[in-house]
């Protein structure tokens, strides 16, 4: 995850980032081609739009993977699937944080009186804001799905443990009388009349 900061003035836009960011590199040729036709706000919109579009395939990939995990058989898959679901949930949290920051920037730009916008600029920023809201809602839905997968896994493990305990209880119930008989006749009593009986062996 890369971080980019922007300062937008009346006749300029400055970006700050620690490494080359492909979204910036992607729009530079367009700006150089048309020159002054793009206002700083238009350039800002282009950059944010590219970033949001870059989020879409990432979110879609995570969504598809969570759908696959939801269909898995926990008995065969084991805890590795749970760890993967939790890891994907963490990725969604980071994506949501990035989208939230961009939403705040766009919202402040729209409501600020110090930002002079044309009607077209305002329309562009409203569109990108709606896209950010939509992607945030998709992320929230997938985070809930990841949480449901975790809950289902916990429920599965609980049922599995209960079944094991039930099986052990049945086995203990079967062997308890046998243990009692073995313990009783393993004692060194001098007189045990039933042992002298001709059917005593079969009875015991």
Residues covered by each model-derived region:
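Divalent-cation
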Residues: 1-31
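Membrane-associated alpha-helical segments
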Residues: 11, 51, 61-185
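A short, charged helix-loop
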Residues: 21-43, 66-76
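Long, non-coiled-coil amphipathic alpha-helical linker/lever segments
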Residues: 34-51, 55, 118-122, 128
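Residue-level signature of the cytosolic catalytic core of signaling kinases
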Residues: 36, 117, 157, 195-197
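Short helix-loop junctions at transmembrane helix boundaries
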Residues: 187-195
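Hydrophobic alpha-helical transmembrane segments
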Residues: 196-204
């Amino acid at each position: 995850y890369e971080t980019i900061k922007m300062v937008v003035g009346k006749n300029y836009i400055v970006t700050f980032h620690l490494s080359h960011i492909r979204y910036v590199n992607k729009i530079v040729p367009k700006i150089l081609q048309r020159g002054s036709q793009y206002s700083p706000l238009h350039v800002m919109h282009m950059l944010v739009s590219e970033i949001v579009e870059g989020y879409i395939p990432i979110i879609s990939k995570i969504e598809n993977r969570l759908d696959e995990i939801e269909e898995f058989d926990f008995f065969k898959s084991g805890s590795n699937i749970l760890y993967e679901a939790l890891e994907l949930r963490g990725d969604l949290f980071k994506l949501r944080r990035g989208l939230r920051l961009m939403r705040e920037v766009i919202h402040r730009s729209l409501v600020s009186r110090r930002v002079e916008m044309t009607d077209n600029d305002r329309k562009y920023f409203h569109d990108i804001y709606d896209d950010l809201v939509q992607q945030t809602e998709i992320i929230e839905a997938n985070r809930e799905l990841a949480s449901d997968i975790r809950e289902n896994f916990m429920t599965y493990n609980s049922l599995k443990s209960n079944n094991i305990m039930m099986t052990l209880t049945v086995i203990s119930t079967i062997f308890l009388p046998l243990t009692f008989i073995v313990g009783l006749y393993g004692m060194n009593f001098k007189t045990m009349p039933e042992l002298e009986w001709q059917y005593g062996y079969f009875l015991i």
